[in-house]
Amino acid sequence: MNMKLKTLFAAAFAVVGFCSTASAVTYPLPTDGSRLVGQNQVITIPEGNTQPLEYFAAEYQMGLSNMMEANPGVDTFLPKGGTVLNIPQQLILPDTVHEGIVINSAEMRLYYYPKGTNTVIVLPIGIGQLGKDTPINWTTKVERKKAGPTWTPTAKMHAEYRAAGEPLPAVVPAGPDNPMGLYALYIGRLYAIHGTNANFGIGLRVSHGCVRLRNEDIKFLFEKVPVGTRVQFIDEPVKATTEPDGSRYIEVHNPLSTTEAQFEGQEIVPITLTKSVQTVTGQPDVDQVVLDEAIKNRSGMPVRLN
């Protein structure tokens, strides 16, 4: 995570290929083996703008990290009027089974594949802080759901909040002030997919390890996702695909920080290309200059390689 994103967290308190249903963005699944879905948008910030970047991220169902990757250098607190913003709504589907819920921590997105619909719903998420990481490489299921969840902090959480001068009760009651929001899907090992009591944090590392969504998004999942639904956690910062027409694309996100120096932006997080990605990038028709630029820029948007 770069310094700008860290500072932001500390200070925060007719498109082709998909459609919006309630608050969720739904993409039809390609039937020809393609993994590339959606189209990017470009918008212009209105003159006299008084809204932070989070406002535009929420308006277009993006996480803050997605918007910052696609728009390097943009003022996150108050984008200037006339600023052109990329809305990264084109993406490569993760290289895993299209079933249940897939959570890609590296891109801070949740994919939900409703059974029998040939669609995928993509929602932005907030994940665990450095040292309080959201699980990766874990497959589980929705064990139960609850409207109006309570929150029972662990002993470590009590100590942390007490040290900050904000002692917690033994149990935080349900309601709008509960950090878990108004709905929760419990998935085992003390983890949950839940809402929030804040108006920021989606697309950031803000939780104690759980998956956080905007309140309208967790309400959508609560109403649509059955108990027993498969949930898979992956960590896939780089995705690549060879499409049915032979075109090759790569989508590069900044990998999750694993050290404080990386989190503070003092060191670049290294990128390792998996074997499945290399089967795409290693083809003789790939433009290596374009590939190198895509890896360097880490825009979070698919880039054509050939």
From Swiss-Prot:
Regions annotated as coiled coil: none
E.C. numbers: 2.-.-.-
GO terms for biological process, alphabetical: cell wall organization; peptidoglycan-protein cross-linking; regulation of cell shape
Pathway, per record: Cell wall biogenesis; peptidoglycan biosynthesis
Cross-referenced PROSITE patterns: LD_TPASE
SUPFAM superfamilies per the UniProt record, alphabetical: L,D-transpeptidase catalytic domain-like
Domain L,D-TPase catalytic: 99-234
CDD domains in UniProt: YkuD_like
Pfam families: Ldt_C (PF17969), YkuD (PF03734)
Compartments, record wording: Periplasm
Active site: H194, C210
Gene Ontology terms: cellular component: outer membrane-bounded periplasmic space
Assembly behavior: Interacts with DsbG.
Function: Responsible, at least in part, for anchoring of the major outer membrane lipoprotein (Lpp, also known as the Braun lipoprotein) to the peptidoglycan via a meso-diaminopimelyl-L-Lys- bond on the terminal residue of Lpp. Can be oxidized in vivo, its reduction depends preferentially on DsbG, although DsbC is able to partially replace DsbG.
Family from the record: Belongs to the YkuD family.
Protein name as catalogued: Probable L,D-transpeptidase YbiS
Natural source organism: Escherichia coli (strain K12)
